[in-house]
Amino acid sequence: MFRLPLQCVLWGCLLSSVHPEPPTACREKQYLINSQCCSLCQPGWKLVNDCTEVTETECLPCGKGEFLDTWNRETHCHQHKYCDPNLGLRVQQEGTSVTDNICVCKEGRHCTSKACESCVLYHSCSPGFGVKQIATGVSDTICEPCPVGFFSNVSSAFEKCRPWTRCETKGLAEQQAGTDKTDAVCGPQNRLRLLVVIPIMLGILFAILLVLVFIKKVDRKPQDKAPCTKQIPQEIDDLPGPNPTPPVQETLHGCQPVAQEDGKESRISVQERQ
Protein backbone atom coordinates (compact mmCIF):
# COMPACT_ATOMS: atom_id res chain seq x y z
CA MET A 1 0.00 0.00 0.00
CA PHE A 2 2.90 2.39 0.74
CA ARG A 3 4.85 1.68 -2.46
CA LEU A 4 2.57 3.70 -4.76
CA PRO A 5 2.92 7.10 -3.02
CA LEU A 6 6.66 6.58 -2.65
CA GLN A 7 7.04 5.82 -6.35
CA CYS A 8 5.13 9.02 -7.24
CA VAL A 9 7.47 11.11 -5.16
CA LEU A 10 10.52 9.55 -6.76
CA TRP A 11 9.17 10.05 -10.28
CA GLY A 12 8.38 13.73 -9.49
CA CYS A 13 11.91 14.40 -8.29
CA LEU A 14 13.33 12.76 -11.37
CA LEU A 15 11.20 14.81 -13.75
CA SER A 16 11.98 18.08 -12.00
CA SER A 17 15.69 17.44 -12.28
CA VAL A 18 15.43 16.72 -16.01
CA HIS A 19 13.05 19.62 -16.78
CA PRO A 20 13.68 22.38 -14.19
CA GLU A 21 10.85 24.89 -13.48
CA PRO A 22 11.45 28.27 -15.21
CA PRO A 23 12.30 31.17 -12.83
CA THR A 24 9.61 33.73 -12.07
CA ALA A 25 11.98 36.58 -10.93
CA CYS A 26 15.53 37.66 -11.66
CA ARG A 27 18.16 39.44 -9.61
CA GLU A 28 18.90 43.15 -9.74
CA LYS A 29 20.44 44.32 -13.05
CA GLN A 30 18.94 41.29 -14.84
CA TYR A 31 15.87 40.82 -17.00
CA LEU A 32 13.77 37.76 -17.80
CA ILE A 33 13.45 36.60 -21.41
CA ASN A 34 12.76 33.17 -22.88
CA SER A 35 12.75 31.73 -19.38
CA GLN A 36 16.27 33.03 -18.95
CA CYS A 37 17.61 35.74 -16.61
CA CYS A 38 19.89 37.89 -18.74
CA SER A 39 22.16 40.65 -17.56
CA LEU A 40 21.22 44.26 -18.39
CA CYS A 41 23.59 46.44 -20.39
CA GLN A 42 25.51 48.97 -18.33
CA PRO A 43 24.95 52.77 -18.78
CA GLY A 44 26.44 54.00 -22.04
CA TRP A 45 25.89 50.63 -23.74
CA LYS A 46 22.97 49.29 -25.80
CA LEU A 47 21.63 45.74 -26.22
CA VAL A 48 22.64 43.78 -29.31
CA ASN A 49 21.63 40.20 -28.43
CA ASP A 50 19.87 38.63 -25.47
CA CYS A 51 21.57 35.92 -23.54
CA THR A 52 20.99 32.20 -24.14
CA GLU A 53 21.65 29.07 -22.15
CA VAL A 54 25.22 29.15 -23.34
CA THR A 55 25.94 32.88 -24.06
CA GLU A 56 25.84 36.11 -22.08
CA THR A 57 23.97 39.26 -23.04
CA GLU A 58 25.70 41.07 -25.88
CA CYS A 59 26.01 44.91 -25.63
CA LEU A 60 27.73 47.68 -27.60
CA PRO A 61 28.74 51.22 -26.50
CA CYS A 62 26.69 54.19 -27.68
CA GLY A 63 28.06 56.20 -30.57
CA LYS A 64 29.10 59.85 -30.63
CA GLY A 65 26.23 62.17 -29.76
CA GLU A 66 24.34 59.33 -28.04
CA PHE A 67 23.85 58.27 -24.44
CA LEU A 68 22.08 55.89 -22.09
CA ASP A 69 22.14 56.87 -18.45
CA THR A 70 20.80 53.68 -16.75
CA TRP A 71 21.25 49.90 -16.75
CA ASN A 72 19.10 48.90 -19.69
CA ARG A 73 18.02 46.51 -22.40
CA GLU A 74 17.55 49.28 -24.97
CA THR A 75 18.50 48.45 -28.52
CA HIS A 76 19.08 52.12 -29.43
CA CYS A 77 20.86 54.90 -27.57
CA HIS A 78 19.24 58.32 -27.03
CA GLN A 79 20.43 61.31 -29.03
CA HIS A 80 21.93 64.22 -27.14
CA LYS A 81 19.63 67.21 -26.81
CA TYR A 82 20.21 69.91 -29.42
CA CYS A 83 20.72 73.37 -27.94
CA ASP A 84 19.26 75.47 -30.75
CA PRO A 85 20.91 78.91 -30.86
CA ASN A 86 17.99 80.21 -32.91
CA LEU A 87 15.82 79.64 -29.84
CA GLY A 88 18.28 81.47 -27.60
CA LEU A 89 19.93 78.30 -26.25
CA ARG A 90 23.56 77.37 -25.76
CA VAL A 91 25.40 74.30 -24.45
CA GLN A 92 26.40 74.66 -20.83
CA GLN A 93 27.85 71.16 -20.51
CA GLU A 94 28.62 68.68 -23.26
CA GLY A 95 26.95 65.29 -22.94
CA THR A 96 28.78 61.96 -22.67
CA SER A 97 27.78 58.35 -23.31
CA VAL A 98 26.01 58.36 -19.95
CA THR A 99 24.80 61.99 -19.72
CA ASP A 100 22.80 64.30 -21.94
CA ASN A 101 23.76 67.80 -23.08
CA ILE A 102 22.79 70.55 -20.63
CA CYS A 103 21.27 73.55 -22.40
CA VAL A 104 20.86 77.01 -20.90
CA CYS A 105 19.72 80.34 -22.23
CA LYS A 106 22.12 82.84 -23.71
CA GLU A 107 23.03 85.95 -21.74
CA GLY A 108 20.04 88.24 -21.22
CA ARG A 109 17.45 85.48 -21.72
CA HIS A 110 15.52 83.03 -19.58
CA CYS A 111 13.73 79.72 -20.19
CA THR A 112 10.06 79.69 -21.13
CA SER A 113 9.46 76.36 -19.35
CA LYS A 114 11.08 73.92 -16.95
CA ALA A 115 12.25 71.83 -19.89
CA CYS A 116 14.01 74.95 -21.21
CA GLU A 117 13.29 74.23 -24.85
CA SER A 118 13.36 77.92 -25.80
CA CYS A 119 14.32 81.28 -24.29
CA VAL A 120 13.05 84.87 -24.31
CA LEU A 121 14.75 88.15 -23.46
CA TYR A 122 14.79 89.43 -19.90
CA HIS A 123 12.20 92.07 -19.05
CA SER A 124 13.83 95.49 -18.50
CA CYS A 125 12.73 97.80 -15.69
CA SER A 126 11.68 101.20 -17.07
CA PRO A 127 12.87 104.58 -15.65
CA GLY A 128 11.50 105.13 -12.17
CA PHE A 129 11.81 101.40 -11.43
CA GLY A 130 14.78 99.35 -10.28
CA VAL A 131 15.64 95.67 -10.35
CA LYS A 132 14.49 93.90 -7.20
CA GLN A 133 15.60 90.46 -8.38
CA ILE A 134 17.84 89.81 -11.37
CA ALA A 135 16.52 87.26 -13.84
CA THR A 136 18.01 83.78 -13.90
CA GLY A 137 18.03 81.06 -16.52
CA VAL A 138 14.56 79.97 -15.40
CA SER A 139 12.96 83.18 -14.05
CA ASP A 140 12.32 86.70 -15.35
CA THR A 141 13.34 90.06 -13.89
CA ILE A 142 11.36 91.38 -10.91
CA CYS A 143 11.06 95.20 -10.78
CA GLU A 144 10.07 97.59 -7.98
CA PRO A 145 9.34 101.36 -7.94
CA CYS A 146 12.13 103.57 -6.65
CA PRO A 147 11.38 104.86 -3.11
CA VAL A 148 11.89 108.45 -1.98
CA GLY A 149 15.59 109.27 -2.03
CA PHE A 150 16.35 106.91 -4.93
CA PHE A 151 16.06 107.12 -8.71
CA SER A 152 16.56 105.22 -11.96
CA ASN A 153 16.85 107.06 -15.27
CA VAL A 154 17.50 104.06 -17.54
CA SER A 155 15.71 100.96 -18.79
CA SER A 156 17.71 98.03 -17.48
CA ALA A 157 17.37 94.38 -16.52
CA PHE A 158 20.26 94.62 -14.05
CA GLU A 159 20.44 98.08 -12.40
CA LYS A 160 18.83 98.77 -9.05
CA CYS A 161 17.52 102.18 -7.94
CA ARG A 162 20.40 104.51 -7.05
CA PRO A 163 20.41 107.01 -4.15
CA TRP A 164 20.18 110.74 -4.83
CA THR A 165 23.46 112.64 -4.72
CA ARG A 166 24.03 114.25 -1.32
CA CYS A 167 25.23 117.71 -2.29
CA GLU A 168 26.36 118.66 1.21
CA THR A 169 28.91 115.83 1.24
CA LYS A 170 30.55 117.47 -1.80
CA GLY A 171 30.48 120.96 -0.35
CA LEU A 172 27.71 121.97 -2.75
CA ALA A 173 24.14 123.16 -2.39
CA GLU A 174 21.09 121.36 -3.71
CA GLN A 175 19.56 123.46 -6.47
CA GLN A 176 16.91 120.96 -7.54
CA ALA A 177 15.51 118.01 -5.61
CA GLY A 178 15.65 114.55 -7.16
CA THR A 179 12.69 112.47 -8.34
CA ASP A 180 12.18 108.77 -8.96
CA LYS A 181 13.61 109.32 -12.46
CA THR A 182 16.22 112.06 -11.92
CA ASP A 183 19.10 112.72 -9.55
CA ALA A 184 19.38 115.79 -7.33
CA VAL A 185 21.08 118.78 -9.01
CA CYS A 186 23.95 120.35 -7.07
CA GLY A 187 25.57 123.76 -7.51
CA PRO A 188 27.97 126.19 -5.81
CA GLN A 189 27.01 127.51 -2.39
CA ASN A 190 27.60 131.19 -3.48
CA ARG A 191 24.98 130.99 -6.15
CA LEU A 192 22.43 129.77 -3.66
CA ARG A 193 23.27 132.63 -1.32
CA LEU A 194 22.82 135.14 -4.11
CA LEU A 195 19.46 133.65 -4.94
CA VAL A 196 18.44 134.28 -1.34
CA VAL A 197 20.17 137.62 -0.66
CA ILE A 198 19.25 139.44 -3.88
CA PRO A 199 15.46 139.21 -3.41
CA ILE A 200 15.85 140.35 0.22
CA MET A 201 17.95 143.38 -0.79
CA LEU A 202 15.52 144.31 -3.53
CA GLY A 203 12.67 144.13 -1.04
CA ILE A 204 14.50 146.42 1.40
CA LEU A 205 15.30 148.96 -1.34
CA PHE A 206 11.71 148.94 -2.51
CA ALA A 207 10.47 149.58 1.03
CA ILE A 208 12.89 152.52 1.44
CA LEU A 209 11.73 153.97 -1.86
CA LEU A 210 8.11 153.79 -0.75
CA VAL A 211 8.94 155.61 2.49
CA LEU A 212 10.76 158.40 0.62
CA VAL A 213 7.86 158.86 -1.80
CA PHE A 214 5.42 159.07 1.11
CA ILE A 215 7.52 161.67 2.92
CA LYS A 216 7.78 163.78 -0.23
CA LYS A 217 4.03 163.76 -0.74
CA VAL A 218 3.46 164.84 2.85
CA ASP A 219 5.84 167.82 2.44
CA ARG A 220 3.96 169.06 -0.62
CA LYS A 221 0.61 169.45 1.22
CA PRO A 222 -0.40 173.15 2.05
CA GLN A 223 -0.07 174.00 5.71
CA ASP A 224 -2.44 176.32 7.56
CA LYS A 225 -0.17 178.89 9.18
CA ALA A 226 -1.49 181.29 11.83
CA PRO A 227 -0.66 184.97 11.28
CA CYS A 228 2.34 185.99 13.19
CA THR A 229 2.26 189.17 15.26
CA LYS A 230 5.23 191.00 16.51
CA GLN A 231 5.19 193.46 19.31
CA ILE A 232 7.15 196.48 18.23
CA PRO A 233 8.14 198.59 21.18
CA GLN A 234 7.83 202.30 20.67
CA GLU A 235 9.10 205.07 22.79
CA ILE A 236 6.45 207.27 24.36
CA ASP A 237 7.37 210.85 24.30
CA ASP A 238 6.67 212.79 27.43
CA LEU A 239 4.46 215.07 25.50
CA PRO A 240 1.56 216.75 27.09
CA GLY A 241 -1.72 215.35 25.96
CA PRO A 242 -4.80 213.73 27.24
CA ASN A 243 -4.44 210.29 25.49
CA PRO A 244 -1.02 208.94 24.84
CA THR A 245 -0.80 206.62 21.81
CA PRO A 246 -0.53 202.90 22.80
CA PRO A 247 2.09 200.63 21.31
CA VAL A 248 1.30 199.55 17.77
CA GLN A 249 1.26 195.85 16.89
CA GLU A 250 2.79 195.02 13.53
CA THR A 251 0.86 192.34 11.75
CA LEU A 252 2.99 189.85 9.90
CA HIS A 253 1.69 188.10 6.84
CA GLY A 254 3.14 184.62 6.62
CA CYS A 255 5.45 185.56 9.47
CA GLN A 256 6.85 188.38 7.28
CA PRO A 257 6.63 191.98 8.51
CA VAL A 258 4.18 194.27 6.75
CA ALA A 259 5.05 197.94 6.67
CA GLN A 260 2.36 200.41 7.70
CA GLU A 261 2.08 203.61 5.83
CA ASP A 262 2.64 206.81 7.66
CA GLY A 263 -0.48 208.70 8.66
CA LYS A 264 -2.72 205.62 8.70
CA GLU A 265 -4.09 204.38 11.91
CA SER A 266 -3.68 200.85 12.97
CA ARG A 267 -6.96 199.10 12.95
CA ILE A 268 -7.79 195.91 14.68
CA SER A 269 -10.56 193.74 13.35
CA VAL A 270 -13.65 193.22 15.36
CA GLN A 271 -12.80 189.54 15.90
CA GLU A 272 -9.41 190.40 17.35
CA ARG A 273 -10.99 192.85 19.73
CA GLN A 274 -13.36 190.26 20.98
Curated annotation (Swiss-Prot):
Disulfide bonds join 26-37, 38-51, 41-59, 62-77, 83-103, 105-119, 111-116, 125-143. Residues 216-274 are cytoplasmic. Keywords: Disulfide bond, Glycoprotein, Immunity, Membrane, Receptor, Repeat, Signal, Transmembrane, Transmembrane helix. TNFR-Cys repeats lie at residues 25-60, 61-103, 104-144, 145-187. Glycans are attached at residue 153. The chain crosses the membrane at residues 195-215. Residues 1-20 form the signal peptide. It is found in: Membrane. Residues 21-194 are extracellular. It comes from the Eukaryota. One of its GO terms (molecular function) is ubiquitin protein ligase binding. Residues 224-274 are annotated as: Disordered. GO terms for biological process: B cell mediated immunity; B cell proliferation; CD40 signaling pathway; cell surface receptor signaling pathway via JAK-STAT; cellular response to mechanical stimulus; defense response to protozoan; defense response to virus; immune response-regulating cell surface receptor signaling pathway. InterPro entries: TNFR/NGFR_Cys_rich_reg, TNFR_5, TNFRSF5, TNFRSF5_N. CDD domains: TNFRSF5. One of its GO terms (cellular component) is intracellular membrane-bounded organelle. Residues 261-274 have a biased composition (Basic and acidic residues). Its main location: membrane. It is a single-pass type I membrane protein. PANTHER family: TUMOR NECROSIS FACTOR RECEPTOR SUPERFAMILY MEMBER 5. Receptor for TNFSF5/CD40LG. Transduces TRAF6- and MAP3K8-mediated signals that activate ERK in macrophages and B cells, leading to induction of immunoglobulin secretion. Monomer and homodimer. Interacts with TRAF1, TRAF2, TRAF3, TRAF5 and TRAF6. Interacts with TRAF6 and MAP3K8; the interaction is required for ERK activation. This is Tumor necrosis factor receptor superfamily member 5.
